[in-house]
């Protein structure tokens, strides 16, 4: 692992330019002859705006403190839209929680390979449900599971969603979100988005059967719709789901009577009619191999799973990590983690944290702040810079999630 430390204690929030108090004094004749000169004063606003749009997103906030003119430029709606259109795209960041009972932590920028001190809006503890898409991040509490917030963690803008329908108390819940990427050039800041909730609850007195319901929130109508009410036999829902190309994928887990430990359900959100039962298992997709756990993610509208590969004789014991892409109903292997990286985590449990977007996958062990990245295009594994989060006691857990840093999108 690379041991170089690289982080900045830089709290993220919009920075408002406050002009310093001017100092008045008499100038000498020599001083009066010298005039201050700034190169950017020669540039028209549109050209300066274009130059600033090539800065990394972390530098945009610092640019706003240079002078009033720069602050007005980087705060304008036109600049925010142009910045998001810039060919020098921002890669997804990874947020790592500092402690289990605090929403603060550090965010990692893989382009300049630096960590930033970062506070999240809305969320209270690290065990909340998290889902992200196109700059927006959804948070849902892990207790009552009825407090849902949608936010832009960079600008700190957020809103509260109304309580979803269905069982008030569930055994398992999976949340995902998707921002409508169609017509991106038009009204980028107010693009519509959806939030899905998959609820799973055991049928009273029957461990073999589980009630499962799917609920979808639309930001356009600001309402929830119940899409599916079904009863699964021998399977239950879990906490893993994602939306790709308007198809909701979520993992299900065997409760006995199946050769598969895990499975995948695909539900087309645009073709589901009135809530009905018996339809979910028709779209069952088996896992690529025996997995200890699986993490679903949307990478450029492709469904990707990062899974722990179990031993042949002991499938619950992890021996490696693989990455697959779903094509139709078949899994195509993209990569397997080299053993030197797998062993670099130290002790690796059968379950772990992994998330990704664009073409970048993050993998993190719950027992260590070490963070590994995998570039899907370059097929390249790389450790992140050392995170400033340190392990303070043996049973301390580490977790996090990735999101796209965007300035222009609002919940």
UniProtKB/Swiss-Prot annotation:
One of its GO terms (biological process) is miRNA-mediated post-transcriptional gene silencing. SMART domains: FBOX. Residues 37-83 form the F-box domain. It comes from the Eukaryota. The keyword Repeat applies. Keywords: Kelch repeat, Repeat, Ubl conjugation pathway. Pathway: Protein modification; protein ubiquitination. InterPro entries: At3g26010-like_b-prop, F-box-like_dom_sf, F-box_dom, FBXO31/39, Kelch-typ_b-propeller, Kelch_2. The F-box is necessary for the interaction with ASK proteins. Component of SCF(ASK-cullin-F-box) E3 ubiquitin ligase complexes, which may mediate the ubiquitination and subsequent proteasomal degradation of target proteins. Part of a SCF (ASK-cullin-F-box) protein ligase complex. Interacts with SKP1A/ASK1, SKP1B/ASK2, ASK3, ASK9, ASK11, ASK12, ASK13, ASK14, ASK16 and ASK18. This is F-box/kelch-repeat protein At3g61590. It comes from Arabidopsis thaliana.
């Amino acid at each position: 692992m690379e041991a170089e430390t690289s982080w900045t204690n830089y709290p993220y929030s919009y920075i408002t330019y406050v002009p310093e108090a001017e100092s008045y004094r008499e100038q000498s004749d020599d001083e009066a002859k010298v005039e201050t000169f700034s190169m950017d004063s020669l540039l028209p606003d549109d050209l300066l705006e274009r130059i600033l749009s090539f800065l990394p997103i972390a530098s945009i906030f610092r640019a706003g403190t240079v002078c009033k003119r720069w602050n007005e430029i980087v705060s304008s709606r036109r600049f925010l839209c142009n910045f998001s259109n810039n060919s020098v795209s921002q890669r997804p960041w990874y947020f790592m929680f500092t402690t289990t009972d605090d929403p603060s932590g550090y965010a990692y920028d893989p382009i300049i390979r630096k960590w930033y001190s970062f506070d999240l809006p809305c969320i209270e503890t690290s065990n909340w449900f998290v889902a992200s898409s196109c700059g927006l991040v959804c948070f849902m509490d892990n207790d009552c599971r009825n407090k849902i917030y949608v936010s832009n963690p960079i600008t700190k803008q957020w809103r509260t969603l109304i309580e979803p329908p269905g069982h008030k108390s569930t055994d398992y819940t999976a949340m995902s979100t998707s921002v409508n990427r169609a017509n991106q050039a038009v009204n980028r800041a107010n693009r519509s988005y959806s939030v899905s909730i998959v609820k799973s609850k055991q049928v009273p007195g029957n461990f073999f059967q589980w009630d499962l319901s799917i609920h979808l929130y639309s930001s356009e109508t600001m309402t929830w719709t119940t899409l599916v009410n079904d009863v699964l036999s021998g399977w239950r829902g879990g906490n893993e789901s994602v939306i790709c190309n308007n198809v909701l994928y979520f993992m299900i887990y065997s409760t006995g009577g199946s050769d598969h430990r895990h499975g995948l359900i695909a539900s087309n959100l645009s073709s589901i009619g009135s809530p009905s039962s018996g339809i979910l298992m028709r779209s069952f997709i088996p896992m690529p191999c025996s997995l200890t756990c699986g993490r679903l993610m949307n990478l450029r509208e492709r469904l990707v799973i990062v899974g722990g590969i179990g031993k042949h004789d002991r499938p619950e014991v992890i021996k490696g990590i693989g990455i697959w892409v779903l094509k139709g109903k078949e899994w195509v292997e993209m990569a397997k983690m080299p053993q030197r990286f797998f062993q670099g985590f130290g002790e690796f449990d059968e379950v772990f944290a992994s998330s990704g977007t664009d073409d970048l996958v993050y993998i993190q062990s719950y027992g260590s702040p070490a963070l590994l990245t995998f570039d899907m295009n370059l097929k390249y594994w790389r450790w992140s810079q050392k995170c400033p989060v340190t392990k303070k006691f043996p049973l301390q857990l580490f977790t996090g999630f990735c999101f796209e840093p965007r300035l222009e999108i609002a919940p």
